[in-house]
Amino acid sequence: MQTNEQMLSAIENYLAQTEFPAEPELLYAPIGYSLAGGGKRLRPMLLTLSCGIFSDDVKQALPAAAAVEGFHNFTLLHDDIMDNAAVRRGKPSVHAKWGQNVAILSGDAMMIYAYRLLSSVPANLLPQVLSTFNTMALEVCEGQQYDMDFEQKPKVSVVEYMHMIELKTSVLLAGSVVIGAMLGGASDEDCRRLRRFAVELGLAFQLQDDLLDSYGDQRLGKAIGGDILEGKKTYLMITAMSHADEATREMLRTAYRDPALSDAEKIGKVKSIYDRLDVPRLTEQQIQLRFERALSILDTLSVAPSRTQRMRDYAMSLMDRKN
């Protein structure tokens, strides 16, 4: 059985060895640029680890792992256009480097590349794998639409927000672990349980992202307070609004939209309100709740506990971050 570091290396090597045609250059160069951009490789790692719970042959999962990474990067290309984001992983985003039309078309080609990779799975599993992938892909689009809808919606509830991030973030993790489990020979029941594991893990991961954006360690290089400056409806903002009295809610609205405030002043004012309302602690409680639920589900799988240890270790490493 490979270590997690060896699995990640195998995924990186597989992606690096993937060849794209030289022409048309403006179609394929952005794909290679995007896939070589690094990142956590979270989704392909979850897929291969899930396969490894049920099978010692995790190499069989590499094409599907590359497929979910390709799909993830397709969503990033289009997300960056919708968000007008000029930077991705410390480098110019594809649309900033090559233009919007190129980014759209290269993203579409990356999606097709993902399907091509998936078509290599064993024929007896192909219908189930494609069904899982298609459901996952459509739900990610639904989540993105809800996220855009929230920008125009004056009030968003915690329930609505959790539903949105489940679709936008968690279902891609869930689809990845289910496909990996299928390739490893898991039962339908174990696939269902792993899906729930990944949903809970994804919710914990996204809530932690929300928290770290405002309370991460700035010494580690990431700017703090980006969500506040953008006025994004995060778990922190929504929780603050739901716990505040009307006077405090108005203070929060004013802090978000006051053009006279500098960036540092805006971040400071909003965080002081969060602190007063105990929002960081409430968020940490929800993160811990979701993460503990995820780990407890691993205990219910029909395999020896030793088979899930690498998945457990990886999940714990994801949540042990400061930025």
Per-region residue spans from a language model:
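All-alpha prenyltransferase/terpene-synthase fold signal
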Residues: M1-N323
